Amino acid sequence: MNHSVNWYFDFISPFSYLQFKTFQRLPNSLDIRLVPILFAGLLNHWGQKGPAEIPSKRTDTYQYCHWYAKRHGIPFRAPPAHPFNPLKSLRLAIALNTTHEVVDLVFNYIW
């Protein structure tokens, strides 16, 4: 029996990148529908700052992500500027039907 789930993501998030890279470990019977969102829109709606906007959280987040990536054998490098505006990347993914291949290419380019 096949199951499907919606996976909401933003290219700005290192956690989205790391989770996406683990999808190949999931059963083939699981259909993951990729749903791009603008994380900043959620943060703004709730009056919050993102972790990358708070220096101490940014440092801890990067350290944790590097540790997690190394532990799981996932290539990881922080983009030259973070936070950055992911809107063009999200629009590109949507224009190209948000396929796993497209999302993988964009994540690999950024992270």
Language-model-detected regions and their locations in the chain:
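Short active-site neighborhood of thiol/selenol oxidoreductases, capturing the structured segment around
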Residues: 2-14
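Structural alpha/beta surface segment adjacent to cysteine/selenocysteine redox centers
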Residues: 15-111
